[in-house]
Amino acid sequence: MELKIFRDALPAAGTNCTLKAELPLETEILISDYLPPVFKLVKCFVRPVVLQKRLQPGKLQLEGYLRCMVYYQGEDGAGLCQTEQKLPFTKLLDLPEFVFTAWAVQVEGQTEYLNCRTVNPRRIEVRGAYGLVVSVHTQVKTDVITALSDGGVEQKLVTLSGVRRAAVLEKLVTVEGEIRFPTPPAAVLDLSGNASVGDLKLLNGKAVAKGVLVVSCAWRAEGDPVLQSQSVNLNFNQVLDVDGLSEDCRCLCVAEPVGFTLTEGEGEEPSRLTATLMLRLRAWRPYQLQCVADAFSTKFETEQTPQTVQTESLACTLDETMTLTGSGPLPDAGAKILACFASFGPALLAYRENNWDLTSRVTVTAFGENSLSELESYEKVLELALPLGRELPSDAELIPECWLRAEDLRCVCANGTLEVNLSVKAEGAILQRSGNTCVGSIALGEPLTPADQEISLRIYYAQAGEELFAIARRFHVSPAQMLAANDLAEGTTAIDAPQRLLVPGAGG
């Protein structure tokens, strides 16, 4: 007799790997004529901006640029000045060979080292390296057995649930607006911003993201070395074309400013501000699929091979804010803090004190003017440990897809001590992988030995916790017959307490 096997496909968890790579940096930056010449270098920062990611069998290609920003003290009392350069890069990474049907790549990292020196007052040499931490997460279409029939087959079904990665989109968008200064700025030291998506609407194949970008501008007036701050809110409303997106998806969208351009207005006209945002959208579609977890035949011997299927589910989503504080002594008790910045290392997960935390190493850099009127750079390292707020086992396989940003940063000098107060915003999702054992293949063998017709019932002493299906399989009888013969409630799957069971029509 032929056994009928029915199959379907589900998006199983695929390869999950993390690798490190180094982006070398070697450049010369020329100070423009409209900027003061260099008196003293204060600090150099490097930030990667990844514009393209291409995943191929055994290869991952990253394209983007390194944003190199140099802060210096200008000559003749010019105060704090800034210049920057964008250095394009293409990085090809070797990966293990694996099959995938959906994927996402998370690129993080931190500066490994930077050496910055003044060649002459209008030429700066920068050498160093940025360490990338690249995480690749995939799903792969996997066939599973969903039902069996004929051949006297009995089956135990299990429902597998998880999420299918429906969409991964990273898109650069432009946001424009105006900023009005009380007096024309002699120099704009820094443009930075925080963006948040306040409303996200899903349509079939489209997403509408509405939010606000808060831009902060540090600038200096003509003849005044004191830094001033100006901020402006720019609203954005972006319609994104997203293949595979539908209204039943679980979705998140994170906005990150990656560049700014300021065009000075003529006369009394306000200056024109153009910001470039990277919108990162992730979407998952929930699914459920019944699979055959175990099977046997009441008429034939069976030979089966187990199959382990890993599914992915959304353990939780993150939209949390946490405040970090820290302090440390300054070499000059009379230092005056002028500006401060925060950079984040890779976001990791750690199990501590019966709870999972999202962790990251945060470096806060503060610029200060010492008692000799020279500018110095001070650093304070903070440790982020954000509780996920959900009970998960200590051995859970979790994958973070998270982004961290500084919502608010304040640094002050009090009695010779640098005091830091940082508000961190964490956005993203935590995926959880779970292993499930199913029947991968099954075939009928030789017919079973006919039951002894003189034996109509057998007695089996079952122990607490034994599964009814396993007992029925041992004697090659239908679980439904076991239920009926022992007056067990319909739906009973396991024995609660030790008891004697009648086994009807048992074979030899």
Give each language-model segment a name.
Residues E446-A484, A489-G508:
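Primarily a LysM-type cell-wall glycan-binding module
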Residues E2-E454:
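Membrane-lipid interaction segments
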